[in-house]
């Protein structure tokens, strides 16, 4: 009952509860933390931390890798899958992506092959199909880990193409929530489609940081679109 009351008081999280898997994981975070963060980006981080480390630690299970170290390998895997527009990937391809990251956290080559099944068995964050293909338990986790990877590594991103592509929109929202979203919003304004401007409007609410001049330019654009002949633009504004 306490959890339901907390969710009702956090509109940014209540929409997530329609998915049974996400609701279960939200309940797990609430159980181990005693409270819920107020932002989606913080909730996803907490879920990953609980699943990849704290849950096992609470049960007294020894783990050779910390949650942070596991993410070092999982984040580039998620990013590569997003860039390939994949929801599942073969074990050989996955290990090729994660080989160097796993070495960087001192996982020996002969031990690396057990990483995927270990993550599945210990956290459920990854799932293996009957055909031996691997996928993240929910697209949300693939998107979140991709956004975290981009945010942490600061690599040049293809905003100009992605802002008008719905496949990338949730990744970009989550990226904005933990980064300076100025370049992203500028790309949305330059594209000037309803889809791109809708993404930019979301960034107004979720961005960790956004330059004042770009924020004002977007607000002025949305105000101007109130008089647009396009009903979709008027609705967005």
Q: What residue spans do the PLM features occupy?
A:
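Solvent-exposed aromatic/hydrophobic patches embedded in short alpha-helical segments
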Residues: 17-22, 26, 47, 140, ...
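Amphipathic alpha-helical segments of the small helical/lid subdomains adjacent to P-loop NTPase cores
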Residues: 1-25, 46, 114-115
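Active-site-adjacent structural elements in folded domains
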Residues: 6-11, 60-64, 112, 129, ...
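Hydrophobic repeat-domain scaffold segments
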Residues: 20, 144-237
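Exposed alpha-helical structural elements
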Residues: 2-3, 12, 43, 93, ...
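Amphipathic alpha-helical segments within well-ordered protein domains
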Residues: 27, 78, 99, 172-176, ...
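Structural motif
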Residues: 8-18, 35, 63-72, 136, ...
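Extended helical regulatory/linker subdomains that flank P-loop NTPase cores
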Residues: 31-37, 41, 45-146, 151-154
